[in-house]
Amino acid sequence: ALQSQLDYLHIVAGTSASLGGAVHIVPPMAIQPAYLAREAGTFKQHLGIPLFVTGRINQPQEAELILARGQADVCGMTRALICDPQMPNKTEHGQVEDVRACIACNQACIGHFHRGLPISCIQRPETGRELQYEQLPPTTRPKRILVAGGGPAGMKAAAVAAARGHQVTLYEAGPQLGGQVLLAQLLPRRSEFGGASTNLQREMALAGVEVVRNTRVDRALVERERPDLVIAATGATPYWPAFERTGDLQVVDAWQILRSEAKPGRSVLVIDWRCDWIGPGIAERLVRDGHQVQLAVNGTHCGESLPLYVRDQLAGELHRLGIPITPYARLYGCDDNTVYLQHTASGEPMIFEG
């Protein structure tokens, strides 16, 4: 009855009425791509006006499939276009493989917006600064550049330098490019993070970067190759906070868990000093592997540093899994079977028995 009064109908699941509903305003990586297409199709069958659908549609192939199935007339792809504004043009000209796909991390788009910062994109840092960085002028003095490290920073630096006309060779010590992205994608419901590495490898290929794997950059290599410039992008190592440690209690870091280098026991206490997605992700992974897990966070709440919708989706998942969370917790020390924490507000001790 209302169709005659409407120009179109837009299907979206988000609502500000609840935290769980707000997650769907800008659905994060944990939610399946194009997850509202089927519901939109149900509406489309009974409507005679144009139908829009949004919700994690991040690839042109997905949008085309939705249209071909008659599930909608228009697909909303806001973050996908922030990540790659040229996506429609690339698709039209048969360059789908060159599209930089959004991974729905929410870190620099809606995450920046909620913090009062200009919108950007972790995969496209020129977003929001197009006047300065959209069109980088070609170099008038080409150099031979050696990039040490095949993580995101090294790959982006190599791609930009090569696109400007420099002769660039990137060296990676291991067999795979990606750096810590290779670890991040191993956390529950974070597999799409690996898309950042895929996209950057494509950028390097298009720019003409030479890639050498399984080769660590050392002084001898630099002296042999004699580049004009070396870009050091060798990454980082896991942070271990200072704490008192006696006895034989097993203590490992997140990298060791993700690389399957450690076999934790039945009862595990995850100490999260960053309040991001690593600690909760490790806790979730261990619970799903059958361990009894508690999570202690060095902040006011779990996911304190995360974008709001990522945080709340993660909080809901941890609650469903029944993972106990202790906030305001700083690691103080451990012995044979006890972990000692300090409440960061009261200063009082908190003791966890093994």
Residue ranges and their predicted role:
Residues 19, 85, 112, 131, ...:
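Glycine/Thr-rich phosphate-binding loops of Rossmann-like dinucleotide-binding domains
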Residues 11, 77, 230-233, 270-271:
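Redox-cofactor binding/interface segments in oxidoreductases and associated redox assembly factors
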Residues 9, 147-214, 272-313, 324:
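Beta1-alpha1 glycine-rich phosphate/pyrophosphate-binding loop at the start
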Residues 1-148, 152, 156-163, 167-168, ...:
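Flavin-dependent oxidoreductase catalytic cores
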Residues 26-32, 134-145, 183-195, 254-260, ...:
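Short, contiguous acidic/charged loop-to-helix segments that flank catalytic cores in large enzymes
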Residues 194-239, 248-249, 255-259, 263-264, ...:
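A Rossmann-like FAD-binding core segment of flavoenzymes
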Residues 15, 235-238, 274:
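Short glycine-rich anion-binding loops that position phosphate/pyrophosphate groups of nucleotides
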